Amino acid sequence: MRFVKESVIRATPERVFAFHEQPDVLSLLIPPWESARVIQAAKISEVGAQAIIETKIFGPITVQWVAQHTVYEPPRLFEDIQVKGPFRSWRHRHIIEPDAEGASLRDAIDYEPPLGFLGRAVAPLLVQRRLERLFEYRHDATRKWCEGESVASGQWPVTSFEY
């Protein structure tokens, strides 16, 4: 299955890529309504590095998600795959390209849900909707940082966003 979210950010591709290279960016990209916490962060610049996130998937069911960085091509692309987690497979490409208004940020995810046929049947209702909400938040957070005053002043880290 595939999920794609694309947004235009009014900043250079280099600035958008630099946002994703910040040490605690993963924590900033977790929406407040998600029951998830970063156990171990990983630099996107280190191919092979693994980030570990503990997240609730349904109700009280918690899983550990291990994502490994597999591609690093600044300032246009980085990629991670799921090594361990809730999906049968997961490949997430973060693509940043020049745009007339700044940069185009595209998250392209190819995934296989768990539970075979049943998982594929419910994915459009459950997984796709959750991804849409999650990546709307992530792109908005990226936009706010890259287009905001923190860029002009060089301030980092931003510790939260107003929603």
Positions of PLM-derived features:
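Hydrophobic ligand-binding cavity/cleft-lining segments
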Residues: 1-42, 46-47, 163
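Generic structural detector for well-ordered beta-strands
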Residues: 6-10, 37, 54, 68, ...
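Beta-strand elements of well-folded, non-transmembrane domains
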Residues: 9-11, 57-59, 71, 86, ...
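Short strand-connecting beta-turns/loops that link adjacent beta-strands
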Residues: 12, 74-75, 99-102
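Glycine-rich portal/gate segments that line the openings of hydrophobic small-molecule binding cavities
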Residues: 38-84, 104, 137-145, 149-150
